[in-house]
Amino acid sequence: MELLKRKENTNLTEKVLQFGEGNFLRGFADWMIDRLNKEYNWNGGVVVVQPLASGLCDKLNEQDGLYDLYLRGLKNGNRVEETRVVECITRAINPYEDTDGFFACAENPDLRFIISNTTEAGIEYIQGQKYGDFHNSTFPGRLTMFLKKRFDAGLGGFILLPCELIDKNGDKLKECILKYAAEWLLGDDFEHWICEENYFTNTLVDRIVTGYPRDTAAEMEQSFGWRDNLIDTAEIFHLWVIEGDKALAEEIPFHKIGLDVLWTDDVTPYKMRKVRILNGAHTMSVLAATLAGLETVADMMADQVVSGIMHRGIYDEIIPTLDLPESKLLQFASDVAERFKNPFIKHYLLSIALNSVSKFKVRVLPSILEYIKRFGKEPANLMFSLAALIMFYRTDEAQDSPEVVEFMRSASPAEILSREDLWGEDISFLLGSVEKYIAAAEKLGVKQAMADLAKEQK
């Protein structure tokens, strides 16, 4: 079979510079842009820049920027599978080998958007780096150099859409760039241009992208009729929340083709929704599920007792503590349940259980505390999950820092709950319920204790 390549030259206008050529952006942002081109005639090409010295640029260029994307999951309870060739990437640049080619993009007046996914550690400022030393600079440092080229060319700024999974990713990126501009003495006019001509948006991205399907790639290539070294796979669900001027949405109108891209004045409530409902549901349920002898998220969702405690935790205890419109919370919770039931993804509970103490502090404990604050009583299902956390850390399955594992294994519940450094505050006032649920689980077994808890709430 021949390698996947273009049959004819592309006539796309290069409008997007993308830092990151990995699975996530190709299965998320590039898929959206490809759909916008084909369904709305946006005609936008993506120039991909490789953030690290080693990467996929050569493979992308060998395939003329093309790759197959296979989406699969549940939609309204039905199994859905979709395959498409994504054609929006015009070329890929390895800036370590072609630095001039990278900086030449700054002089393209059609270029309007910068998308990035350089990992959570990518957006950082390190003092003492030298202007012009591309190879030894951070991503924000390189971007500062790129923006200076743009400024010197007398061109307008960009709409920046960072996808790194950190709070206020756009604000942090802008802050780093301004620090480099000041340290490198690039001038007040340039700093003013950064602030006035460029739009740094804060974003929240949500899609599970599972990447290259090693086990089934050969079989998939047979069905395609060509070889593809860059097959990407992802779930059906997608969400991109962008905090920025809603007028900018008209320049990249994903909403016109029904994509779940939301422009808002504040991304925080949506981030809280994701952390509390999606991540919180994982963390509140996987430890009890593991103690009950289950292995995967699919097993957990198929078990009525375990999935029941998660369902009641989400709908009766987490959602009432959140302030978005109820319809948006209920729809997201419904989507989460479908995502957890995805028959195409084998998600092991123990992989989710990694570092559960710190996860519980961020994902579940705030819901417990807010529930108590609003309703004057403890949320039973979330309290059971806290008891399950303590019991889980007494097993050999717990994976965390050696200090946390050793302490959690040997300490009493009272000692654990009083550790302010673990929880951000002393939560000893929760001890009564925790000890009650631990005693029930030790006497009856975790599964029966959960079943009894369900009966109490009927």
Language-model regions, residue ranges each:
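Substrate/ligand-engaging "lid" and interaction regions
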Residues: M1-K458
